[in-house]
Amino acid sequence: CVNKATKVLQFLTSESKEYVATLSLGTSTDTYDASGKIIETKEFHALDNNEIVACFNNFIGSQEQKPPIYSAIKVNGKKLYEYARAGEQVEVPTRSVTVNHLEILQIENNLIKFKVGCSKGTYIRSLCVDIAKKLGYPGHMSKLIRSQSGHFRIEDCSTLEDIEAGHFHMLSIEEAFEHFDKYVIEDENIVIHGKMIKSDIDHQV
């Protein structure tokens, strides 16, 4: 977003997200992803695919999730990763999140590739670690791609090469919010002077 569009960015980023991730079983790290320090290992033995599917299905719906200690969430005015880097102990609060759907795309040895649709604020790293624990293994997220944010899909995005070459389309605010309900205000002075607007739209406007 650029110029005036930055004022409405919060309404777009608050929508649901979709990711394609890979869970690696047998090794856990302090960051919950492949960039961290290994803290536990366990020899992997093949699991029954039906057992894996049943485990994943248990994570669909609303739940309390504990974020990774290496995250930007603030506790007492300080980011969690700052506590971690300083070697300080801190209680990591859980958050209410919702997993709308989970689809296993591929199972290959200790690697499970899956697609997940979830609410804003869901940590896929934590989801991977929690699923691994349910399956009886330490685990971490070894790969992550955000495939969709709200109505914006990755296949509709422009690459850096496209942008550098000038081959891209900049969405207008109207295009970006075309999937939102709209309320037309006849007199803009009503808004300017802060007058209450009556509407039968009870959600996003």
Language model features with spans:
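Accessory RNA 3′-end/elbow-binding domains used by RNA modification enzymes
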Residues: 50-53, 111, 115, 133-205
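RNA pseudouridine synthases
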Residues: 1-156
